[in-house]
């Protein structure tokens, strides 16, 4: 069996035609595309200028919500309409709480990036969210160590400031791939 969005399990043999088979498998990954595109754009901007544009996050969240609605209707699982935004908001609130523990460690852009990526990861369910947070921790620590060691901007205003959006986005990709393929 193949694990689809939100834990729906279907056998490839259960589809009534090759077309439905292809749509189901392709749609699984297309559903995450809005957050992926937004995440890549935001990561590049965070690396270059240490800012996460809120407008880009808003557009990415809106596009991902549309994808969530489409998937929920196609899979006939309206719980997805609650699950994805709930995990996204909970993750963003947790990230905001963590950033308040040590002020200056993470900015509001990292919190909004977590919200946008949380919509995609939240579609994959609780296991994906847990894997995402573990991957965020591990990749974040590795990214921080590498960035501080090889900082290409060490002679600029941004010296010593680590952009965390790439770690958040990479962890989201790892979590979605790990939980949908396994």
Report residues per predicted region.
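A membrane-topology feature that recognizes alpha-helical transmembrane segments
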Residues: 1-182
């Amino acid at each position: 069996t193949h694990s689809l969005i939100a834990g729906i399990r279907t056998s490839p043999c259960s589809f009534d035609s090759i077309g439905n088979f292809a749509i189901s498998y392709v749609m699984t990954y297309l559903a995450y595309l809005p957050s992926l595109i937004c995440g890549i754009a935001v990561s590049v901007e965070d690396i270059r200028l240490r800012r996460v544009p809120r407008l880009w996050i808003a557009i990415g969240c809106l596009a991902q919500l549309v994808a969530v609605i489409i998937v929920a209707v196609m899979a006939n699982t309206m719980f997805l309409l609650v699950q994805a935004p709930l995990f996204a908001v909970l993750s963003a609130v947790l990230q905001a709480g963590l950033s308040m523990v040590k002020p200056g460690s993470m900015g509001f852009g990292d919190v909004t990036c977590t919200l946008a990526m949380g919509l995609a990861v939240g579609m994959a369910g609780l296991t994906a969210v847990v894997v995402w947070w573990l991957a965020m921790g591990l990749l974040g620590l590795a990214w921080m160590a590498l960035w501080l060691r090889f900082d290409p901007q060490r002679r600029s205003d941004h010296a010593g400031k680590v952009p965390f959006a790439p770690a958040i986005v990479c962890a989201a990709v790892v979590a979605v791939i790990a939980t949908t393929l396994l």
